[in-house]
Amino acid sequence: MATKFSRKTFLKAGAAGLGMMALNVCTASAAAPQEDANCLDFLFKKQKTPKTTYAGTRKTLFWYSETLKQDCNYSVYLPASYDENNKAQAYPVIYLMHGVGGHQLNMIERFSTPDILNDLIGSGELPECIAVFIDGYNSFYYDGPGLAMETAIIHDLIPFIDKTYNTLASKEGRIIGGISMGGYG
């Protein structure tokens, strides 16, 4: 059975509280400025303690890119209910891209994205989902001289993720977001 979610809710939280959610938070704060004058603080502060007891798992692994002819780093967040043997349960996927000079762990360590996902899923604001943290090197996530990163993501990484994990393997089951260079890609 596939996870049911509204496209609006999934898009709102698509970047696990980063870019797109910042716009929503700031818009809400602008309507009620007395509540939160620094609506972007969550982007720059490491969240110390998760607000819920919900806990997904995170792994750092490699995928082989035929396009790039090399192994590439990625990290994955799996929801607490994830069972690789339960092919009937499919999850939407959030693809997250780091900024220039970084790597996929920046989205995890600097921004505490797994904690944000745990809080959003645990509170019911986001359906259970898989998050993939892409290492884009300094490619700006497009096909440039010497590194066809956009092609590698589209033709190699996404099919690899769909084959490896129980995903909603369609455009309706995917969203992509990032910060800085990752927002450009």
Segment roles from a protein language model:
Residues M1-F5, G19:
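Secretory targeting signals
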Residues F5-S6, E172:
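Intrinsically disordered, low-complexity sequence elements enriched in Ser/Thr/Gly/Pro
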Residues K12-A22, A30-G185:
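Non-catalytic cap/lid and distal C-terminal segments of serine-dependent acyl enzymes
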